[in-house]
Amino acid sequence: MMLASERHQLILSMVREHGAVRLTELVERLGVTAVTVRRDVTELADRGLLTRVHGGVTLSRARGGHPEPGRAASVFGPAAPGALVGMVAPSVEYYWPTVIQGAQSTVAAAGGRMVLRASSYDAAQDRRQITKLLERGVQTLLAAPATTGRGALDLLRWLGTLSVPVVLVERLPPPELPTLALDAATTAHALGAGLAVRHLVSLGHRGVGLVTSRSSPHSPAVRAGWRETVASLDLDAGAALDLDVPVYGSHGWAAEYDALLDRCRRAGVRALLVHADWEAIGLIERARDGGIAVPGELAVVSYDDEVASASDPPLTAVCPQKHRLGAVAAELALARLADTTERPVHRLQLWPTLVVRESCGSTAETGPA
């Protein structure tokens, strides 16, 4: 199986040779699914290396498929060229690296430079890192700040007073700050949860439970989408278990996961949506060690698709469009910086997709319907 970087090089080589290539040709040449090709093409287009056209791709306007600095633009308006963009991310390990890459590629395509600082889901640390970037002289900020907990509201109010444009990434102001005028790029996590539930129902399940990580800021949105879909489809209320678990590998995790599986067995739950990947992998591990067949006796859909394909069996997963999310956030920031007139607040939400593998007993790939 080719690595993503190898596929990208082959795609660029084919486009440089022929000038334009149809997506169906790429699927045949690469030996992967259309979904995978579309992801690869989107990433290359976000980096300014290709231009998407109906049914295919061509070289970008930059010669030879290399990014042309200073000429980037988006549906949000012209992009400020040569900008120094700051970004504060809550992690540089799970989920966020792809978001960061998407933002960095977009800034580079506009001839700018991105400066990154990592935080730790803590409002005080967020503020320290943002202050350092402001002292560095950044002209605009991408931030994924804490929105709950001690100091979060004060942090968000402070962000709203800064003289440089701020774009929230995977964050929205809480209900306490309904008029905070900050642009934002987010994922429709509630919709993603609904995709997972509807997929399990399409396979014959009439009861779908939910398992969420206690540490994830996305769990409330995933839970809201799960609840809404379970109610709208009139699924078995007795099987609609709403459970949370500690982080996979943390102290005492195995005993808690075993207890959860026992509760599912007693309630007759045979399908679960699990947020996030590591928790889903841990749950499958404990299930199989306990003699529960996956997917034969328990179907599992994971949420995040960071390491889901490495599970045994590979996990069907809801996949947020992380690279595109970072790119869109950067586009918003650069457009805001370039527009000297009064422009309205932009809040953009991207739909995730569903990647179907083996953990539910189906092997086709699909997207939102």
Model-predicted segments: where are they?
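HTH-adjacent hinge/linker in prokaryotic transcriptional regulators
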Residues: 3-6, 17-20, 41-114
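Short, solvent-exposed amphipathic alpha-helices that sit
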Residues: 10, 95-109, 192-195, 217-237, ...
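Periplasmic-binding protein-like
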Residues: 86, 138-146, 209-211, 265-276, ...
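Short beta-strand elements in bilobed, periplasmic/extracellular small-molecule ligand-binding domains
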Residues: 108-118, 210, 227-254
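Flexible loop/hinge segments that line or gate small-molecule binding clefts
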Residues: 146-194, 278, 304-315
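Hydrophobic alpha-helical segments within soluble ligand-binding/sensing domains
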Residues: 173-175, 180-210, 220, 253-261, ...
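Flexible loop/turn connectors
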Residues: 262-369
